[in-house]
UniProtKB/Swiss-Prot annotation:
Single GO molecular function: rRNA binding
Subunit relationships: Part of the 30S ribosomal subunit.
Protein name as annotated: Small ribosomal subunit protein uS14c
Keywords: Chloroplast, Plastid, Ribonucleoprotein, Ribosomal protein, RNA-binding, rRNA-binding
NCBIfam families: PRK08881.1
Gene assigned in the entry: rps14
């Protein structure tokens, strides 16, 4: 199980990302379409002044049950260990063990 501080840090990042998503998107759009070099520098500095954790790339997918950061299935939000256990217990609807 992951440390609670790491899980809380991820929650904080998700919250910040949602808060600054619109502002970041508009600044990036202006930056990409701008032709003037001086205005581009100004927009770049505004983007850099936004909180670092408000960037979407800083978010790490974690298992919602254990907080494990690696081996997470996106569809279920579970790590591979928990996914296997829950699938064996028939707690995941529509998931069956394959056989051929």
């Amino acid at each position: 199980m992951a440390k609670k501080s790491m899980i809380e840090r991820e929650k904080k990042r998700i919250k910040l990302t949602k808060k600054y998503a619109l502002k970041r998107a508009t600044l990036l759009k202006k930056y990409q379409t701008e032709e003037s070099f001086n205005l581009k520098l100004e927009l770049h500095s505004k983007i850099q002044k936004l909180p670092r954790n408000s960037a979407k790339t800083r978010i790490r997918n974690r298992c919602w049950k254990t907080g494990r950061p690696r081996g997470v299935f996106r569809d279920f939000g579970l790590s591979r260990h928990v996914f296997r256990e829950m699938a064996h217990q028939c707690l995941l609807p529509g998931v069956t063990k394959s056989s051929w």
